[in-house]
Amino acid sequence: MRLRYDLLFLGFLLLNISLAIFGEKCYNLRKLFGENMKYIYQNPDWHNFRWHGEKIQKLLLDIKKAQGYLLGKMDVLGFDVKNNALLQVLTENIIKSSEIEGQILDKHIVRSSIARRLGIDIGGETPVSRDVEGVVEMMLDATQNYADKMTKERLIGWHAALFPTGYSGMYKIKVGQYRDDELGPMQVVSGSIGQEKVHYQAPNADILEKEMSDLIDYINKQDDIDYLIKAGIVHLWFVALHPFDDGNGRIARALTDMLLTRSDDTQYRFYSMSAQIQKNRNSYYDILEKTQKGSMDITDWLVWFLENLLIAIQSSEETTNTVLHKAEFWQKYSTTIFNERQVKVLNRFMDNFEGNLTTAKWAKMCNCSQDTATLDIKDLIEKEIFVKVGSGRSTHYKFKNKI
């Protein structure tokens, strides 16, 4: 009997010694394996991302091959053609990245803002939008200055550019600084009021300074990890931290573009990862939620990320073909005289113009009268560039020959 009590006492003593020495680790393990474990950053080996190399390797090889083919194809083209391809891809990237978050930007304002900053002449003037200017600044810094060191100040500058008024919609937010938990924890929630579903809860604000410092160090670190994999890791890591009151998704995708540009090692962007993510928006959120609630094995996330990156590169054929067709058009009509309005509309018409071109749309695009629009269009018909289709209210115009 005495022996049993001695053994119980010894076991109790060893348990308390273990808790005293390894208390934090034991607590973390309970969170890992017990009911309290919910999110990836609660893993005791948080930051030590793992993946199965054999599942990733073939994807990397396929992507490298597709990258090489695309860059080789574009490299032989002239300066103006490459600039127009860059303009088109950056425009799509910015629009689609914002669209993922439910924000719809005017394509022509975005395009005009990028063109102005890159010194590309697209003809005509387009009004400036404060919302557009900020996101364009961020994307151009990420892709044109891709080799620059990432710093807290640079990242905070991106955030400030996204929210120049200090408001997100009607709500005042903390701009140019990491979030706090003054109004409660940062959560990703869906559903109507009273029926909300919490998909994810980010780490407490009091650890963000250290966590973001670790992430920034990782971005800048020179190591053997392929930039394609690093882009996927940084995307996940940043979204997991959700360091700002708003704009986290757009900044995560800007960081992704920066690292993909490092992989390509050129300022020219000929494919849009954000456009591909937008196409698969539901599965994007699903895989993020699953990964954010899992272990440090992020193989499934990286497979999803790399598969969609490969599709994005392969899908760039449509974009590059549009640019090439435009170049061929302007080369063919290099000696033809066009006024500024005609140049503006012709360029827009060749950029996947939505709907039919009418005199009313022409007048609106060029801020001119319908009589002037009619004369402009009539001139293009006489030059055998446009043909008239339909009659009455259904009258519209299209290219005489396929572009």
Model regions: which residues?
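FIC/Doc superfamily catalytic core
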Residues: 2-403
